[in-house]
Amino acid sequence: GASGRNGGMLPPRYKKGYAAIAKRYGNDVSRRLHGLMLEAVDTVEAIVEDCDIDCDFHRSGQLTAAHSSEHLRSLEADRDWMASEAGDKAARILDRHQTMDEVGGGSHVGGWLDPRGAGIHPLNYTRGLATALLARGVEIYGRTPVLRLVEEPASVRVETPRGSIRARHAVIATNAYTDATGFAPGKLDRRIVAINTSVIATRPLSANVAATELPARRMVADTKHIMNWYRITPDNCVIFGGRGDITGRSDNPGVYAMLERQIVETFPQIGEARIGQRWSGKIAV
């Protein structure tokens, strides 16, 4: 799930924040997670370069837009923790006016900016990975659902409708659909939670409007409990995501109408820009 569905944002920060993670789990755990998050973005960049994948990877920076003074103080605590406990001083705090300059609208009181955040075209990245793997001799079987994983003394047996495969290791990369597999009860329970998300995308904006609304082309997410996130694509479409239908419906017009109101509130100059695409589905957190 989400291989081609998500917004293609690679943030170097968790929504919870490193200071909050450290308070609950300790500095060592938070430092490890901090390193893993930075490594993840670096790894994707290295794969894109090594495999020559055309997927619009670019480090335009990640902006977390605070919706309250309390949220801004939390971002400031995160910046301070990173500097003192991880020796990382890359991120900086923006005031209200600096944040407005970055976003062009909305009601943010400030923000967090990390230049290491990146954007990517997720479906083209997935296709590029498949092409690179096939070129290296990897066999990919589509339309072959895994029915069962059986752990054996020295291997794992993967059972499918077309036969079984034995391997030393099996990677369960099922994202939001892990609960449906039943592969590893107890091992993955409550570690991966599926949520429904909905996304809209405008038709291409004029160069002038695009330069006004997201001039630095940041990857942006806000700090609301049910957050909105947004970015601009290389062809000047704004992708804007948020909460999906709680029942899992992918065609709820009320959800899309809500997103259309929110995108205009965030980007007033977009006005009645036509929406070119709408989609919904599950992603994992």
Language-model features and meaning:
Residues 61-71, 115-119, 145-146, 246-248:
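Conserved short loop/turn motifs at secondary-structure junctions
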Residues 13-97:
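Dinucleotide-binding Rossmann-like beta1-alpha1 core, especially the glycine-rich loop
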Residues 91-95, 139-141, 274-278:
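General small-molecule cofactor/ligand-binding pocket signal
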Residues 73-85, 106-169:
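Helical element adjacent to the flavin cofactor pocket in flavoenzyme catalytic cores
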Residues 1, 42, 50-59, 146-148, ...:
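Active-site substrate-recognition segment that forms the wall
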Residues 30-33, 37-41, 71-75, 118, ...:
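Generic structural signal for well-ordered, non-membrane alpha-helical segments
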Residues 14-19, 104-105, 235-237:
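Short connector loops/turns at beta-strand edges and beta->alpha or beta->beta junctions
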Residues 1-7:
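Glycine-rich FAD pyrophosphate-binding loop
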